[in-house]
């Protein structure tokens, strides 16, 4: 399975998954149909599936146009997004699986950013080291999504699921927010040498207009404060009594950053 990262709008990423053997493709969160149609034409591939993580327009905005171009495409989304994702035919819940390119993705229910958000995790195949996580706006490189419909406790539970994935899991998040996320992270975790090194690397990459996605779970566990809410120094820094309170205060600080 080949993964093509397509930039869209000011900071979105769309991911086209390609199976060269069958010459079929799937797309994750097609915000804008045009770059997807262009990539499919370049590949000469037929679109067979749309994997949506949640209902926001900058993730599902291309669904209808892509369905017009490829009427047999199957649209997947979360069970609780019924009626909110254009063209949705499959309503997924925790523990479900979806198939593409002779691989099966495990579905995780990860509410917080929205009440219905899901993520897709492709475990590594035999002989491969890396798994692939498509997590929409739940986990970002260096950050996490705002809480529009969920609670801090829900988001901590959701991020815990993703944090528990193998460290050799690539994180394909849907926005190029990494530099600003790490700028915030340094204000609350300034003694973190891994974080300082990562910030320099990301700063250099963005100065060259290079993408910083994908990340990986191992790196996020070292440097992302929103996966480190149970670290004693962050609990102390935020004057919190519990990990969930620490997360909530970190999220509130980031919202004002």
From Swiss-Prot:
Broadest EC class assigned to this enzyme: hydrolase
Keyword Zinc part of the UniProt annotation: yes
Keywords recorded for this protein, A-Z: Hydrolase, Metal-binding, Zinc
Cofactor binding, note field: Binds 2 Zn(2+) ions per subunit.
Known EC number: 3.1.2.6
Annotated residues for binding of Zn(2+) 1: 54, 56, 113, 137
Any one GO BP annotation for this protein: methylglyoxal catabolic process to D-lactate via S-lactoyl-glutathione
Catalytic activity: an S-(2-hydroxyacyl)glutathione + H2O = a 2-hydroxy carboxylate + glutathione + H(+)
Record flagged with keyword Hydrolase: yes
Pathway: Secondary metabolite metabolism; methylglyoxal degradation; (R)-lactate from methylglyoxal: step 2/2
GO molecular function: hydroxyacylglutathione hydrolase activity; metal ion binding
InterPro entries registered for this protein in UniProt: Clx_II_MBL, Glyoxalase_II_hydrolase, HAGH_C, Hydroxyacylglutathione_Hdrlase, Metallo-B-lactamas, RibonucZ/Hydroxyglut_hydro
Cofactor requirement: Zn(2+)
Subunit architecture: Monomer.
Role: Thiolesterase that catalyzes the hydrolysis of S-D-lactoyl-glutathione to form glutathione and D-lactic acid.
Family per record: Belongs to the metallo-beta-lactamase superfamily. Glyoxalase II family.
Listed name of the protein: Hydroxyacylglutathione hydrolase
Organism: Acaryochloris marina (strain MBIC 11017)
Origin organism lineage: Bacteria, Bacillati, Cyanobacteriota, Cyanophyceae, Acaryochloridales
């Amino acid at each position: 399975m080949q993964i093509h990262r397509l930039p869209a709008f000011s900071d979105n990423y769309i991911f086209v998954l390609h199976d060269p053997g069958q010459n079929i493709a799937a797309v994750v969160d097609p915000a804008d149909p045009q770059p997807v149609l262009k990539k499919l034409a370049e590949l000469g591939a037929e679109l067979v599936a749309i994997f949506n993580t949640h209902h926001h327009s900058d993730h599902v905005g291309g669904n209808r146009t892509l369905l017009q171009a490829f009427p047999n495409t199957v649209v997947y989304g979360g069970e609780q997004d019924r009626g909110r994702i254009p063209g949705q035919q499959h309503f997924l819940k925790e523990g479900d699986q979806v198939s593409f390119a002779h691989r099966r993705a495990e579905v995780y229910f990860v509410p917080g950013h929205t009440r219905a958000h899901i993520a897709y995790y492709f475990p590594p195949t035999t002989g491969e080291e890396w798994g692939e996580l498509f997590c929409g706006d739940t986990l970002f490189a260096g950050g996490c999504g705002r809480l529009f419909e969920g609670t801090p406790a829900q988001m901590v539970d959701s991020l815990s699921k993703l944090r528990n994935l193998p460290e050799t899991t690539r994180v394909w998040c849907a926005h190029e927010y990494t530099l600003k996320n790490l700028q915030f992270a340094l204000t609350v975790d300034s003694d973190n040498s891994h974080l300082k090194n990562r910030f320099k690397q990301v700063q250099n990459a963005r100065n060259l207009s290079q993408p910083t996605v994908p990340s990986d779970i191992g790196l996020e566990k070292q440097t992302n404060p929103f996966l480190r809410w149970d670290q004693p120094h962050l609990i102390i820094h935020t004057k919190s009594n519990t990990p969930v309170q620490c997360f909530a205060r970190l999220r509130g600080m980031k919202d004002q950053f």
